[in-house]
């Protein structure tokens, strides 16, 4: 019976959306997200992608209602994009080919005492509102800024929006909207003796000339530390003891693109294919499923108001503990 039910899911899903309902939903979706297309042909091709994504979402959620998945999906502003396009235009992690970890930057966890069962830095006032990087490969800048903001709050008691555009334009070791790496950003802030606030250096979502101005400086750092590679226990300790941590993940799957709620775990997520930088702002457990609380930079229309709960202690799912780091202040 179970096998028959699963086989019937695509048929049931397709039957849920006759053509006239699809037409209505398409028009509503375009209006909701203010979508306009250059030509009729462009709109037709985008609608086909949207319909394919809608079908994927419907089938997944039917399976979730049967207990197959621990999370649900929903249509969002990325509905007319393929997962390949999302990775190309809206991620941006670029790991240096010559990257090497040294004892000078390695974070050695303090294992004394027990780490809290759950931590949420949003409730402690360490986390600024969710941002939207747009179609610029600047995830690394938003991840870095988020970690810096958390440490600034911890050290000074003040929560300020720092400038990802400052990093996009000025970190010469990275490639701006073409991609970058978080520790390069921390090194820049250290050598530059500061990073501007968002108010002083607003985000524009494209590469510009470096316009850093010391009068707008809002934070600085003394270097960075890296979590032992692939060690989720060390990452948990770092989150609990340090604050929000910059992490890298595989965000290439359609399931990630349309995540809505629940604890995200997709066995197809590749821990060796790290393409997106995000911010770990806590951890916990939901309905028996351990998770990380992750802040993304795709706006509040994505996920659960811009956040996703990602599986914790499930063989380093999506590679979340492979390239974790934080700044020292």
From Swiss-Prot:
Stretch forming the signal peptide: 1-15
Please name the InterPro entries in this protein's record. Papain-like_cys_pep_sf, Pept_asp_AS, Pept_cys_AS, Pept_his_AS, Peptidase_C1A, Peptidase_C1A_C, Peptidase_C1A_papain-like, Prot_inhib_I29
Q: Does the keyword Disulfide bond apply?
A: yes
Q: What is its main location?
A: other
Protein's UniProt keywords contain Transmembrane: no
Query: Where is the catalytic site?
Result: 139, 276, 296
Q: Where in the cell is it found?
A: Lysosome; Secreted; Apical cell membrane
Q: What is its EC number?
A: 3.4.22.38
In which domain of life is the source organism classified? Eukaryota
Q: Which UniProt keywords apply?
A: Cell membrane, Disulfide bond, Glycoprotein, Hydrolase, Lysosome, Membrane, Protease, Secreted, Signal, Thiol protease, Zymogen
Q: Which residues form a coiled coil?
A: none
GO CC, sorted alphabetically, is:
apical plasma membrane; extracellular space; lysosome
Give the enzyme class. Answer: hydrolase
The catalytic activity, as recorded, is: Broad proteolytic activity. With small-molecule substrates and inhibitors, the major determinant of specificity is P2, which is preferably Leu, Met > Phe, and not Arg
Q: Name one Pfam family in it.
A: Peptidase_C1
- Sites carrying sugar chains: 103
Q: List the disulfide bonds.
A: 136-177, 170-210, 269-318
Task: Set out the biological process GO terms recorded for this chain's protein.
Answer: proteolysis involved in protein catabolic process; thyroid hormone generation
Q: Which residues form the propeptide?
A: 16-114
Q: What terms describe the molecular function in GO for this protein? A: cysteine-type endopeptidase activity
For membrane topology, the record states:
Peripheral membrane protein
What role is this protein assigned? Thiol protease involved in osteoclastic bone resorption and may participate partially in the disorder of bone remodeling. Displays potent endoprotease activity against fibrinogen at acid pH. May play an important role in extracellular matrix degradation. Involved in the release of thyroid hormone thyroxine (T4) by limited proteolysis of TG/thyroglobulin in the thyroid follicle lumen.
Q: Which family does it belong to?
A: Belongs to the peptidase C1 family.
- Note the PANTHER family from the entry: CYSTEINE PROTEASE FAMILY C1-RELATED
Report what the protein is called. Cathepsin K
Organism encoding this protein:
Bos taurus
